[in-house]
From Swiss-Prot:
Record's protein name: Chaperone protein HtpG
GO function terms (MF aspect): ATP binding; ATP hydrolysis activity; ATP-dependent protein folding chaperone; unfolded protein binding
Region (A): 1-344
Keywords: ATP-binding, Chaperone, Cytoplasm, Nucleotide-binding, Stress response
HAMAP family reported for this sequence: HSP90
Subcellular location(s) of the protein: Cytoplasm
Region of interest (C), ranges: 562-634
Assembly and binders: Homodimer.
Lineage of source species: Bacteria, Pseudomonadati, Pseudomonadota, Gammaproteobacteria, Vibrionales
Family: Belongs to the heat shock protein 90 family.
Length: 634
């Protein structure tokens, strides 16, 4: 290695999040400690990718050493394991930035989700991406020697830490480009100071790495005995997995490659590997994770596919190839048609990019369609993890709106459960004769939806209603207006018409009752004034005296709540007050001749209706006064 210590040594403190991560990782990932090798080899592979990319415009960065690879050696006497690469390397500033801090958005949120429960924590830490810090699972101290490509030998850096509160960084001289990571192994990490143990782990985790991973081994004589001479022996295939034939790749290899590109610990739910030739030549390898990333709902978090051009790594998190509602998809795309000097800005308006985005989107949706059709249980697993972001699809992807809609799942009155298992396709298949609309109800919770008074008439007529209680649902329904030629109809809107399910005798009776109650409606409207938009009778209720509904083109209650929660200005919602003339309480109100007492009845019935609809009211004290007055009178 021929490094000599120079000067400018300083001791620095770790960022507080690094301390937390180190502590949690050492304790939570102890049972799966061999993953440190996967992480460090994966980092070395990334360093080689980055050098290749930068050398496209500056070949001198290779420094006459273009054969990139990773080398592992160990020294039992000194109790060290060394992982060396001749990739891009790091400058002093980069060492401090990458090895002393966690430069990720949402770090505080990540730590708040940790439960101190080992199995759950290890899963979350895996999703977060432990990378370099995984070295401390098996080492009680780590030394890093590195020189960035393009810098002189005396601009190399030595970093050292015992994994506690501090680390040191100093200038050294290092002739070779790249990074050496020297692990000073713990007692329980010494199992990795063994050639066959290392071979086993490399074969398990790193066979798919696109550069050679070699191990230092002793040369054997003709009799098979070890000599003092050592050599480097390549352990892995060193062929990029996605360039191989699908028939030659095992499920285990696909699963390990997923863990390499995603830094996830769990196996993926499913994947799709495709090579396309024609107008656009490209290979895609797309994975659906089995668990949602911890920061999936943070739309600002960078996500996307790895982009390669002609097998040369270009960038991570290329979000241009996948719509935002599929931001959980992991994997890569390798294009033969994009220029090697492509940038994020060029990708933005590139026709090839648009074509690849469309193809990858269809590929993922087709994968999910097959899963939904062939394995209902597995699809439900997917929906529980990713259903919320899938509901962003109809607004974002007009071209695939019907396809996305067919993948959505909801609760409904047909199934007595909060589980979202009902597809729109199955709802349409069960529609009653004469039914031309898909009925739905939005609410704050499943319990609120299930017990909504708006459902009473639908239950009586045997009409299924989709129950929506995710915060995003009301917003979703602004964009999802029809499915399979059937319009959606909110059952809390004033324009709801169920007359096609009523006989002529029933209609005639309702008309008579409506006329008889006209004076009660007018008295109620006179009392309420402009507090409501309108007062009218309704025959949609059975056990409830009154409800409030919104006009067809008025903002709904749940949408108003969504905007308010987001801190946006919300226009006042003017409700239509509907009273049930067949209910005992409404009849009592109608019989009341004293206008002051009549007003108290109106306050109670309107208050009840507002509570059922909104879960709150503007003036609870007025409502309570009216109730107390009526109870006292009784």
């Amino acid at each position: 290695m021929n490094e000599t210590v120079a000067n400018n040594k300083e001791t620095r403190g770790f960022q507080s999040e690094v301390k937390q991560l180190l502590h949690l990782m050492i304790h939570s990932l102890y049972s799966n400690k061999e993953i440190f090798l996967r992480e460090l080899i994966s980092n070395a592979s990334d360093a080689a990718d980055k050098l290749r990319f930068q050398a496209l415009s500056n070949p001198a960065l290779y420094e006459n050493d273009a054969e990139l690879g990773v080398k592992l050696s160990f020294n039992e006497e000194h109790n060290t394991l060394t992982i060396s690469d001749n990739g891009i390397g790091m400058s002093r500033e980069e060492v401090i930035s990458h090895l002393g801090t966690i430069a990720k958005s949402g770090t505080a949120e990540f730590f708040s989700k940790l439960s101190q429960e080992q199995s759950k924590d290890s899963q979350l830490i895996g999703q977060f991406g432990v990378g370099f810090y995984s070295a401390f699972i098996v080492a009680d101290a780590v030394t890093v020697r590195t020189r960035a490509a393009g810098l002189s030998a005396d601009q190399a850096v030595l970093w050292h830490s015992a994994g506690e509160g501090e680390y040191t960084v100093e200038d050294i001289t290092k002739e070779s480009r790249g990074t050496d990571i020297i692990l000073h192994m713990r007692e329980d990490g010494k199992e990795f100071l063994n050639e066959w143990r290392l071979r086993d782990v490399i074969g398990k985790y790193s066979d798919h790495i696109g550069i050679p991973v070699s191990i230092q081994t002793r040369v054997r004589d003709e009799e098979g005995k070890e000599t003092e001479e050592v050599k480097w022996e390549q352990i892995n295939k060193a062929q990029a997995l996605w360039t191989r034939n699908k028939s030659d790749i095992s499920d285990e290899e696909y699963q390990e490659f997923y863990k390499h590109v995603s830094h996830d610990f769990a196996d993926p739910l499913l994947w799709s590997h495709n090579r396309v030739e024609g107008k656009n030549d490209y290979t895609s390898l797309l994975y659906i994770p089995s668990k949602a990333p911890w920061d999936m709902m943070n739309r600002d978090h960078k996500s996307g596919l790895k982009l390669y051009v002609q097998r040369v790594f270009i960038m991570d998190d290329a979000e241009q190839f996948m719509p935002s509602y599929l931001r959980f998809v992991r994997g890569l795309i390798d294009s033969n048609d994009l220029p090697l000097n492509v940038s994020r800005e060029i990708l933005q308006d590139n026709k090839v990019t648009q074509s690849l985005r469309g193809a990858c989107t269809k590929r993922v949706l087709t994968m999910l369609e097959r899963l939904a059709k062939n394995d209902t249980d597995k699809y439900q697993t997917f929906w529980k993890e990713f259903g919320l972001v899938m509901k962003e699809g109809p607004a974002e992807d007009y071209a695939n709106r019907e396809k996305v809609a067919s993948l959505l799942r909801f609760a409904s009155t047909e199934v007595d459960s909060a589980e979202q298992t009902v597809s729109l396709e199955s709802y349409v298949e069960r529609m009653k004769e004469g039914q031309d609309k898909i009925y739905y109800l939005t609410a704050d919770s499943y319990a609120a939806a299930k017990n909504s008074p708006h459902l009473e008439q639908f239950k009586a007529k045997g009409l299924e209603v989709i129950l929506m209680f995710d915060r995003i649902d009301e917003w979703l329904m602004n964009y999802l207006t029809e499915f399979d030629g059937k319009q959606f109809q909110s059952i809390t809107k004033a324009g709801l018409d169920l007359s096609q399910f009523e006989d002529e005798q029933e209609k005639e009776k309702q008309k008579e009752t409506e006329q008889e109650f006209q004076s009660v409606v007018e008295r109620t409207k006179s009392y309420l004034g402009d507090r409501v938009k309108e007062v009218r009778t309704t025959f949609k209720l059975a056990n409830t005296p009154a409800v409030v509904v919104t006009d067809d083109f008025e903002m709904g209650t749940q949408m108003a709540k969504l905007l308010a929660a987001a801190g946006q200005a919300v226009p006042e919602v003017k409700y239509i007050f509907e009273i049930n003339p067949n209910h005992t309480l409404v009849k009592q109100m109608a019989d009341e001749t004293d206008e002051e007492a009549f007003g108290r009845w109106v306050e109670v019935l309107l208050g009840q209706a507002m509570l059922a609809e909104r879960g709150s009211m503007e003036d609870p004290s007025q409502f309570l006064t009216a109730i107390n007055s009526l109870l006292t009178k009784g």
